[in-house]
Each structure stands twice: as C-alpha cells, then as structure tokens.
C-alpha cells in the first residue's frame, strides 16, 4: 500500500510540474504569436481573441482522446511537422502517438518520470502546433508559406524578449491591447465553472 501511495505522490508531483510549465509556455508562445500577428499581419484585438478562442477549441478537441497528439493533428491536416529542438518528430515518441498506456499500471515510476521529463520538452511544439492548426482552420494559413513564416516570426519575438514570460505578457498587452494569457485563463476558469 505504501508503494502505491508513493507512486501516486510522485506522479501527482510530476503532473503538477508539467501543468506549471505548460501554463508558462502558453503565456510565452501565445503572447509572442499575438505580437507577431499584430506587428506583421496587422491583426487587432478582436481577431487575436477569436484565434485564442479557436485554439481553446482545438486544444479541447485533442484532449478528448489520447489517440492523437497536437503535432500529429497539425501534420495530418496541413502537412507541417513541428519538432522538438533535438530534431525528433512525434513519429519517434510513444507518448506523443498514444502507443503506451500510463493508467493500467504497466509503467514503472522511473518510466513515468522519464515520460513526464520528455513531455516537458515537448510543450513548446505542442502549443505551437495548436496555434498553427487554429490559423490553418480559421484563417486559411497554408503550410507552404504562411505557417512557416509565422513560426519564424514567433521565434524572433520570443528571442527579442529572451523568452521572458512577464516581459512578453506586458509587451502583448501594450502592443495588441490584450494580455492573451489572462484572457485564456479567464476562459478556462469559465469553462470549468460551467462543467
């Protein structure tokens, strides 16, 4: 019994770390995307909010099943493949293509922790894939030119602000008139309050 409780505590701690990093990366990437869309594409506040709403829909669509990852959904619909910094694709990783089951007790604690460590590294590609898929679906951004261009612009803005979440959040509010992460947080709170 103590072993099972220890496994649960370790798993919960790893899950909390993953959620914390997800929130941080969402703030960084969404803010950079909003700034890029404002600076280079002339988007205003309302259009940015509309895209944020679409990304929530896409995120919830992906979360309904563990059979497809966000990078997989993006590639299947657009032909665009996002990769992690080490050049790995979602094709290479079991936890991104649902070929493992973490809930039936088949994973050991070290295996579970290793999976969570790898998932931490894959947060930016997953968040980016969600934004790109939303741009493709809602705004007709194609995979041949426009999606790669916005990826480059987002990366440039992240670099400009040194991936500083607070600086990006403030710049997003100053430049676009909305703090996207605060908007997203309020929509998530509303979603769970209604559920």
Residue ranges and their predicted role:
Residues 3-35, 67-137, 165-195:
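Intrinsic disorder/low-complexity detector
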Residues 1-2, 7, 41, 59:
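Long, low-complexity interaction regions most often at the N-terminus
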Residues 38, 137, 148-153:
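A structural feature that tracks compact, well-ordered secondary-structure segments
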Residues 44, 142-143:
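Small-residue hinge/turn detector
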Residues 41, 139-140:
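Helix-turn-helix-type domain boundary/helix-start signal
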Residues 48, 146-147:
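Small-residue helix-packing motif on alpha-helices
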Residues 36, 40-59:
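N-terminal interaction modules that seed assembly of large macromolecular complexes
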Residues 51-61, 150-159:
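Amphipathic alpha-helical segments that form the core helices of the histone-fold
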């Amino acid at each position: 019994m103590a072993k099972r409780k220890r496994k649960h505590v370790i798993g919960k701690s790893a899950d909390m770390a993953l959620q914390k990093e997800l929130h941080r990366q969402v703030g960084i990437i969404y803010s950079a995307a909003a700034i890029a869309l404002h600076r280079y594409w002339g988007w205003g506040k309302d259009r940015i909010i509309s895209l944020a709403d679409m990304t929530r829909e896409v995120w919830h669509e992906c979360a309904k099943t563990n059979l497809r990852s966000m990078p997989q959904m993006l590639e299947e619909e657009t032909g665009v493949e996002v990769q992690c910094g080490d050049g790995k694709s979602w094709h290479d990783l079991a936890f991104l293509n649902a070929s493992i089951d973490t809930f039936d007790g088949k994973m050991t604690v070290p295996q579970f922790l290793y999976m969570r460590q790898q998932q931490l590294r894959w947060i930016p590609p997953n968040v980016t894939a969600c934004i790109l898929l939303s741009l493709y679906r809602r705004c007709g951004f194609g995979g041949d030119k426009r999606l790669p261009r916005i990826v480059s612009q987002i990366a440039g803005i992240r670099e400009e602000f040194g991936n500083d979440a607070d600086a990006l959040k403030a710049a997003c509010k100053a430049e676009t008139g909305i703090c996207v992460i605060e908007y997203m947080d309020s929509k998530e709170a509303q979603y769970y309050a209604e559920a």
